[in-house]
A protein has these predicted regions:
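A structural boundary/capping signal
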Residues: 2-165
Length: 165
């Protein structure tokens, strides 16, 4: 869609909003339209504020920077991240693992993506591989609130027998 808009010189810009990808159209008269690309609906500032408060925090505020244009890499990463979450939700762990590996191509040392890959490996019963990734996350992000849960999972995995695949 963005490629077609670019070829037709349409002022359609991708925006990585905190809750999802949205599209921004800047009209020649200065008016800005925001569109939900999943259903084509026009989005008001009120709707974006509701999304923030419902998905992020009741005290979250909408800032103009939330509507900044995203570059192609950001869009691809967001789409892959959304795909990975959907695949994990659907228990399609092999595909989720491939998606996680693709995301790691952008930033191979991202502790959060390495954590996610470790969680996927654990779901695939590849605990010995999961241990490395989960331990890396805890080492890199000891203050992250989820680190304590990951430590418990590491302890649980460490006490299991290793199954060779």
């Amino acid at each position: 869609l963005l490629w077609v808009a670019n070829r037709l010189d349409l002022p359609l810009l991708p925006v990585i909003f905190p809750t999802q990808l949205i599209l921004r159209i800047e009209c020649p008269d200065g008016e800005i339209w925001l569109i939900n690309p999943f259903n084509g609906e026009s989005l008001s500032e009120h709707m974006l504020d509701v999304w923030l408060k419902g998905n992020i925090s009741p005290s979250a505020e909408l800032f103009y920077e939330d509507l900044d244009e995203a570059d192609n890499i950001e869009v691809i990463r967001k789409l892959l991240d959304t795909l990975k979450a959907s695949l994990m939700e659907e228990n399609q762990m092999e595909l989720a693992l491939r998606t996680s590996e693709a995301l790691l191509q952008f930033n191979p040392e991202d502790p959060y993506e390495i954590r996610d890959r470790g969680l996927i490996y654990a779901q695939l019963d590849c605990e010995h591989v999961a241990l490395n990734d989960l331990s890396y996350f805890v080492e890199q992000c000891p203050e992250d609130p989820i680190s304590e849960m990951i430590r418990a999972q590491i302890n649980n995995i460490a006490h299991k027998h290793i199954v060779l695949h």
